[in-house]
């Protein structure tokens, strides 16, 4: 018995074209180009979700280092002193303190000063 793909194909095409909304030109309107672009965009999304974590961590390190250098110390010495002093603040919190609450960051720096 012959099976035709009319309904299945239409649903599959609609699903791909719906996900391709916002793409430019034929990449939005033509199924084959939309499918190719969608595969590429899904690859980029997967890859960049991993890279996002790395980029934010490096941004936090840069911000903490800048705040440390304002108080005559380096990032590596500061982080080592935190570990020795058994203060468990992560880089995200420290970077936020360095940007928005310099007094709190300075108090943390003073509390680890003896371990520098």
Swiss-Prot record:
One of its GO terms (cellular component) is ribosome. One of its GO terms (molecular function) is rRNA binding. GO terms for biological process: ribosomal large subunit assembly; translation. Pfam families: Ribosomal_L20 (PF00453). InterPro entries: Ribosomal_bL20, RIBOSOMAL_L20_CS, Ribosomal_protein_bL20_C. Signal peptide: none annotated. Transmembrane segments: none annotated. Binds directly to 23S ribosomal RNA and is necessary for the in vitro assembly process of the 50S ribosomal subunit. It is not involved in the protein synthesizing functions of that subunit. Belongs to the bacterial ribosomal protein bL20 family. NCBIfam families: rplT_bact (TIGR01032). This is Large ribosomal subunit protein bL20. The gene is rplT.
């Amino acid at each position: 018995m012959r099976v035709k793909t009319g309904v299945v194909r239409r649903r599959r095409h609609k699903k791909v074209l719906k996900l391709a909304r916002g793409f430019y030109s034929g990449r939005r309107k033509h199924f084959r180009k939309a499918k190719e672009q969608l595969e590429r965009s899904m690859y980029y999304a997967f890859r960049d979700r991993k890279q996002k974590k790395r980029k934010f961590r490096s941004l936090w390190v840069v911000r903490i280092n800048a705040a440390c250098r304002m108080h005559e110390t380096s990032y590596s010495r500061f982080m080592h002193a935190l570990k020795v002093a058994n203060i468990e603040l992560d880089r995200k919190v420290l970077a936020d303190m360095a940007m928005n609450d310099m007094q709190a960051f300075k108090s943390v720096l003073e509390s680890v000063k003896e371990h520098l």
